[in-house]
Swiss-Prot record:
Coiled-coil segments: none
Binding site for substrate: E352, R380, K381, G403, Y404, G405, T406, L407, E408, E409, T415
Family: In the N-terminal section; belongs to the IPP transferase family.
Role, per record: Bifunctional cytokinin synthesis protein; part of the gene cluster that mediates the biosynthesis of cytokinins such as fusatin, fusatinic acids or 8-oxofusatin, known for their growth promoting and anti-senescence activities toward host plants. FCK1 is a bifunctional enzyme that performs the first steps in the biosynthesis of Fusarium cytokinins. It first condenses adenosine monophosphate (AMP) with dimethylallyl diphosphate (DMAPP) to yield isoprenyl adenosine monophosphate. It then catalyzes the removal of the phosphoribose to produce isopentenylaldehyde.
Gene name of this polypeptide: FCK1
Induction: Expressed during infection of barley and Brachypodium.
Stretch list, region Adenylate isopentenyltransferase: 1-266
Domain of life from the UniProt record: Eukaryota
One GO MF term attached to the UniProt entry: cytokinin riboside 5'-monophosphate phosphoribohydrolase activity
InterPro entries for the chain: LOG, LOG_fam, P-loop_NTPase
Tagged with keyword Transferase: yes
Known catalytic reactions: dimethylallyl diphosphate + AMP = N(6)-(dimethylallyl)adenosine 5'-phosphate + diphosphate; N(6)-(dimethylallyl)adenosine 5'-phosphate + H2O = N(6)-dimethylallyladenine + D-ribose 5-phosphate; 9-ribosyl-trans-zeatin 5'-phosphate + H2O = trans-zeatin + D-ribose 5-phosphate
Disulfide bridges in this chain: none
Protein name: Bifunctional cytokinin biosynthesis protein
Length: 487
C-alpha cells in the first residue's frame, strides 16, 4: 500500500470517557482494528481494575497491545512494537484505530507513525464536568460487582511471589489506581481484621484518585496533545460526552462520519498541499449579547450556515454568548471545530466563566471551536486580522449586530485598510436596518468632506448572509497597501 493511503484514526480522551466503546464503533465502520495505547491495559493480569475491554465490549474487533506483559514488566518497547503493528495492519488492508489516553506513550507513538508517512484524523472525547465524577463512581461500582476485590487479591499474591511481599506501587501492574487505595483492606482481610471501613475508604479514594487522574489527562490534552495535533495540521474533532442518552447522536454518529470521510476520501476531510488554494477566512465582529429581537441571532446563525456551504473558516473574539456564540456554534455544528478559531483575552475568558458559572476549561466550550487565550485585546486583534490577511481569496471582515466593542473593532479594520495595512474587504450585515444610522452618518461624513468617496467605499453593506459572501467575493476597488512602510 502506498504511503499516501496509510490512514489511521486516533481516539483520545481521559479515563472513563468511553474511548473503548467509540474505538470499536469506528473500527467496525472503517474495516479497522484497534491499537490500545494504555500503559496498564498492556498487562496480562488486572483486567478489571485497568478497565481492559472484555470480549463482549470488543464485539469481534481485534485489539492489539493489550495483555502482552507480565505483572512485573514495564512497557519499555511499547512504541516500537506499536509502530510495527501499524505496519502489519496496513499490509493486511486494515485501518488502525489508535485508542488511548496515556500521557507517556501517546505522543511518542504518534511521532513515530507520522515520521513513517502515516496520515491521521483525531477525535478527542471530553467529559462534561457535571456528569464526569458520577460516571467514574458508577464505573468503579461496576468493577466491584465484576469481581474487583478478588482480582486485587490475586495481584497481592503476585506481589508476594514476584516482589518478595514488599509492596511497590510504582512498578508493573501494581501502579494501577485501585491497588494502593485498597491495599490496607487487602492486608486486613488476610488477618481477619475489621475490613468494612477500610473497604469503604479505599473505594472512595479509588474514585477520587481516578477522577483526579482524569483531570490530569485533560490538562495534558490541553497543554500537549492538542498543540501537537495543531502543529502537525491533523484534523481533530472534539466531542463532549454527557451521558448514555446523548451518546449516539452527540458522539458516535459525528465521530463515525468524520472517520469514514477521512478514510474513504470524502470531500468533508481534505488535505491542503502547498499548491492548493488557501482556505477562505472571515473575521466577524458581533455582540456578546443576543439583543431583544431574535432576528439578530438568526442572522448570525444564517451566516454560519452560509460559511459552511462555501467552505469558509471563521475567526472571532472567542465568546460563547450572544451573536458571537450563535455564529460560532452553528458553524462548528456543521463543519466541525477546526472551522472556527476563537481568540480571547484572558481577562474576558475569566469574566465569561464567572458570568456563566462554568470553569474556564469546561469541555462545553469545545462546541464553539478551537480557542486561543491571549494576554490583551491588542494581541487578539492582531492575530485575528493576520488570519484574514493569510486567508485565501474572498477573505475579509464582517460586522454583525452589536454595541461599542463591535463598532470599535469594525472601524479599526476599516482604518487599517485606509492606511494600507491590509487590502481585504469589509462588510456590514445590516439586518432589518439595524445599521441605517451608521450608513447615514457615513454619507454625512463624505458630504462634510472628512473622507472621500473612495474611502467611503471601503465598507460595503449587505442585507443577507448570502449578500455578505458576495460582497467579499468582490475585491475592494482600490488598495493603498505598500504605500506606507509599516513595521
Amino acid at each position: 500500500m502506498e504511503s499516501t493511503n496509510r490512514f489511521m484514526i486516533g481516539v483520545f480522551g481521559p479515563t472513563g470517557v468511553g474511548k473503548t466503546k467509540l474505538g470499536v464503533s469506528i473500527a467496525k465502520s472503517v474495516h479497522g482494528q484497534v491499537i490500545s495505547v494504555d500503559s496498564l491495559q498492556c498487562y496480562s493480569p488486572g483486567g478489571i481494575v485497568t478497565a481492559k475491554p472484555t470480549p463482549e465490549e470488543m464485539d469481534g474487533i481485534e485489539h492489539h497491545m493489550i495483555g502482552y506483559l507480565e505483572a512485573e514488566e514495564e512497557p519499555t518497547n511499547f512504541v516500537a512494537e506499536a509502530v510495527e503493528r501499524l505496519e502489519k495492519l496496513c499490509d493486511h488492508g486494515a485501518i488502525p484505530v489508535v485508542v488511548g489516553g496515556s500521557t507517556s506513550l501517546t505522543l511518542p507513538l504518534l511521532r513515530g507513525a507520522l515520521n513513517r508517512g502515516w496520515r491521521m484524523a483525531a477525535i478527542t472525547l471530553l467529559p462534561h464536568q457535571s456528569t464526569y465524577l458520577g460516571n467514574i463512581e458508577s464505573r468503579v461500582d461496576d468493577m466491584l460487582e465484576a469481581g474487583l476485590l478478588e482480582e486485587l487479591s490475586g495481584l497481592k499474591s503476585l506481589e508476594d511471589r514476584n516482589l518478595n511481599g514488599k509492596p511497590n506501587f510504582h512498578k508493573g501492574i501494581w501502579k494501577t489506581i485501585g491497588y494502593q487505595e485498597l491495599y490496607p483492606y487487602l492486608e486486613a482481610q488476610r488477618s481477619d481484621g475489621h475490613c468494612d471501613e477500610l473497604l469503604k475508604s479505599g473505594l472512595a479514594s479509588m474514585k477520587e484518585n481516578t477522577f483526579q487522574y482524569g483531570n490530569t489527562q485533560l490538562e495534558w490534552i490541553r497543554q500537549a496533545l492538542s498543540p501537537f495535533l495543531h502543529a502537525e495540521k491533523i484534523a481533530n474533532m472534539s466531542l463532549t460526552v454527557v451521558d448514555k442518552t446523548s451518546w449516539t447522536r452527540g458522539v458516535e454518529k459525528p465521530a463515525i462520519r468524520m472517520a469514514s470521510d477521512f478514510c474513504y476520501a470524502s470531500t468533508s476531510i481534505s488535505f491542503h498541499p502547498i499548491n492548493e488554494p488557501k482556505p477562505r477566512v472571515i473575521c466577524i465582529f458581533g455582540g456578546s449579547s443576543s439583543g431583544n429581537d431574535p432576528a439578530h441571532m438568526e442572522a448570525a446563525k444564517s451566516l454560519g450556515r452560509v460559511c459552511h456551504e462555501n467552505s469558509i473558516k471563521l475567526v472571532y473574539g472567542g465568546g460563547t454568548t450572544g451573536v458571537m456564540g450563535a455564529i460560532a456554534s452553528t458553524l462548528v455544528e456543521l463543519s466541525g471545530p477546526n472551522a472556527v478559531h476563537g481568540i480571547i483575552p484572558e481577562a474576558l475568558l475569566k469574566y465569561e466563566a464567572k458570568e456563566s458559572g462554568r470553569h474556564a476549561q469546561d469541555s462545553a466550550f469545545a462546541r464553539y471551536g478551537r480557542r486561543t487565550v491571549v494576554k490583551d485585546m491588542h494581541t487578539r486583534k492582531r492575530l485575528m486580522i493576520q488570519e484574514v490577511i493569510d486567508g485565501g481569496d474572498g477573505s475579509g471582515f464582517v460586522g454583525l449586530s452589536g454595541g461599542y466593542g463591535t463598532l470599535e473593532e469594525l472601524f479599526e479594520v476599516i482604518t487599517w485598510h485606509q492606511l494600507g495595512i491590509h487590502d481585504r474587504g469589509v462588510c456590514l450585515l445590516n439586518m432589518d436596518g439595524f445599521f441605517d444610522g451608521l450608513v447615514n452618518w457615513l454619507g454625512n461624513v463624505v458630504k462634510k468632506g472628512f473622507i472621500g468617496l473612495q474611502d467611503a467605499a471601503i465598507l460595503s453593506i449587505a442585507s443577507t448572509a448570502e449578500g455578505v459572501v458576495k460582497c467579499l467575493d468582490q475585491k475592494p476597488g482600490f488598495s493603498r497597501k505598500g504605500e506606507l512602510e509599516w513595521v
